[in-house]
Amino acid sequence: MRFVMPGDRIGSAEEYVKGEGVYEEGGELFAAVAGKLIIKDRVAKVESISPIPEIVKGDVVLGRVVDLRNSIALIEVSSKKGENRGPSNRGIGILHVSNVDEGYVKEISEAVGYLDILKARVIGDNLRLSTKEEEMGVLRALCSNCKTEMVREGDILKCPECGRVEKRKISTDYGKGEW
């Protein structure tokens, strides 16, 4: 066994079969993560020195709203709570209007806005998300008019620059810089 760093050449694709932690480029195999190189039965894999976290049902994640439709928001998931490094299965999560709040929400745009940063719980496969819990919801929002960061005033958000008032599903951690 030897220690390898990301990008280190392991061998050719003719010599070994690509395993976990290894990628192939131009017929050559390279380490995708830092760790111990293990070759067994002609399968080359790299065992990471610090495992890459995976997002599973029940986890709390941080993400940014990248698209809004009538009944869903697409959330670019970037972090998993309690982990110092990004998860391996980060991607686009789906927040359906029925999973926003305990009360009735007609359209998703009543609860989240484009580029909002939010905290959500994973409730199913394919990164299905929910913000129904009190501490889940928008952590940071930009004014849809002038893009200034909104300030919380009770149950609403107000733009300190242009005075615009907007409604969101606000997290209890809004504006605290923590999640």
UniProtKB/Swiss-Prot annotation:
UniProt-listed InterPro entries: Csl4 (IPR039771), EXOSC1_C (IPR019495), Exosome_cplx_N_dom (IPR025721), Exosome_Csl4_arc (IPR030850), NA-bd_OB-fold (IPR012340), S1_domain (IPR003029)
The protein's name in its UniProt record: Exosome complex component Csl4
Originating species: Archaeoglobus fulgidus (strain ATCC 49558 / DSM 4304 / JCM 9628 / NBRC 100126 / VC-16)
Keywords tagged on the record: Cytoplasm, Exosome, Metal-binding, Zinc
One Gene Ontology cellular component annotation held by this UniProt entry: cytoplasm
Binding site for Zn(2+): 143, 146, 159, 162
Record's function text: Non-catalytic component of the exosome, which is a complex involved in RNA degradation. Increases the RNA binding and the efficiency of RNA degradation. Helpful for the interaction of the exosome with A-poor RNAs.
Domain S1 motif residues, every copy: 58-137
HAMAP family: Exosome_Csl4
